[in-house]
Swiss-Prot record:
Part of the 30S ribosomal subunit. Contacts proteins S5 and S12. The keyword Ligase does not apply. One of its GO terms (biological process) is translation. This is Small ribosomal subunit protein uS8. Keywords: Ribonucleoprotein, Ribosomal protein, RNA-binding, rRNA-binding. GO terms for cellular component: ribonucleoprotein complex; ribosome. The gene is rpsH. Belongs to the universal ribosomal protein uS8 family. One of the primary rRNA binding proteins, it binds directly to 16S rRNA central domain where it helps coordinate assembly of the platform of the 30S subunit. The keyword RNA-binding applies. PANTHER family: 40S RIBOSOMAL PROTEIN S15A. It comes from Mycolicibacterium smegmatis (strain ATCC 700084 / mc(2)155). GO terms for molecular function: rRNA binding; structural constituent of ribosome.
Amino acid sequence: MTMTDPIADFLTRLRNANSAYHDEVTLPHSKLKANIAEILKREGYISDYRTEDARVGKSLVVQLKYGPSRERSIAGLRRVSKPGLRVYAKSTNLPRVLGGLGVAIISTSSGLLTDRQAARQGVGGEVLAYVW
């Protein structure tokens, strides 16, 4: 059966593994999910990710990051633009998450960017998710 919203599934698996203090989470691979994982790694929300060959297709293994006393690096994840209600933002009206403490992941014509990168490049796009 096909999945309606693979990005929401990706974020939900991360949220569930994070709240259960798992060290890593395995999920179906796609280039979009790998790009989101790259942004999360660059911003310091996850420690690493890798692609593995599974029996069918590929898998994306994301290693979660915790502080010295097991405090979570990811406090929250929220899907913004959904298949039933797409959310777009102009370059002049990009969202700020928690006053700049969090990050908005935006799909632009230049690829996936954070809100700060999109503002710097002067491009808008579809607001995929908020991470804080």
